[in-house]
Amino acid sequence: MLRVSFEQLLEAGVHFGHLKRKWNPAMAPYIFMERKGIHIIDLHKTILKIDEASSAIKQIIRSGRKILFVATKKQAKQVVADKVSFVGMPYVTEHWAGGMLTNFPTIRKAIQKMTVIDRMAHDGTFDLLSKRERLQITRQRAKLEKNLGSIADLKRLPSALFVVDVMKERIAVSEAKRLDIPVFAIVDTNSNPNGIDFIIPANDDATSSIEVILNAICDAIIEGKEERMMDTSINNENKEKTVSVFRKRTKIEGRSKKDSLS
């Protein structure tokens, strides 16, 4: 896996926390010092936490499960969409619809509605509608795409959540906890880390900070997928060997029976 260096984190500004007066005391173990009224995050601990999170994420992906990324703040939207779509994971960057996890069956219905509209556009049904009906459906499709487009392929609840800024995404975190879904999160010095399963202490306001962490996480996802492919290949090879041995044994036993009868 890609191991982020101290220098990379420093250059990306990962160490910059919030003003001392805005801090959450629960983040004290991850604070190195205070400089000019601003808390400085201990990057050695950040590296350890990135490694821990990366290892856990790789195992989740290796087992064939999905991780849902949530980042609706301006500084994180684009970088998360770019990085996460590249590795084929679902993400929410526009708006967290309440009940997206706790009321997942309803969300699935909305996704299915998108699928129906897309099918109408492809099979010609759309052309049979009036101009007004087409406009209404097009607007409806655009709204669904904005809110749910990136999770359209999510057939079941995700196995984990990765969150940028636990304060802003508190509803998503709350829903995940209610369903016992593990939460990975970039947590700044003004946030409460309690209840977060995998804490990555870091600046969650700078795009450069978010990006350098996502690079490591996405690399772990790629490795997890590669190892899953290898596991599948080995399993298929073992199955073929087992079938081959079984067939040979069956032939030998068949010959033995014929010999004993003759």
From Swiss-Prot:
CDD domains: RPS2. The keyword Methyltransferase does not apply. GO terms for cellular component: cytosolic small ribosomal subunit. It comes from the Bacteria. Transmembrane segments: none annotated. GO terms for biological process: translation. GO terms for molecular function: structural constituent of ribosome. Keywords: Ribonucleoprotein, Ribosomal protein. PANTHER family: 30S RIBOSOMAL PROTEIN S2 PROKARYOTIC AND ORGANELLAR, SMALL RIBOSOMAL SUBUNIT PROTEIN US2M. Belongs to the universal ribosomal protein uS2 family. HAMAP family: Ribosomal_uS2_B (MF_00291_B). This is Small ribosomal subunit protein uS2. It comes from Azobacteroides pseudotrichonymphae genomovar. CFP2. The gene is rpsB.
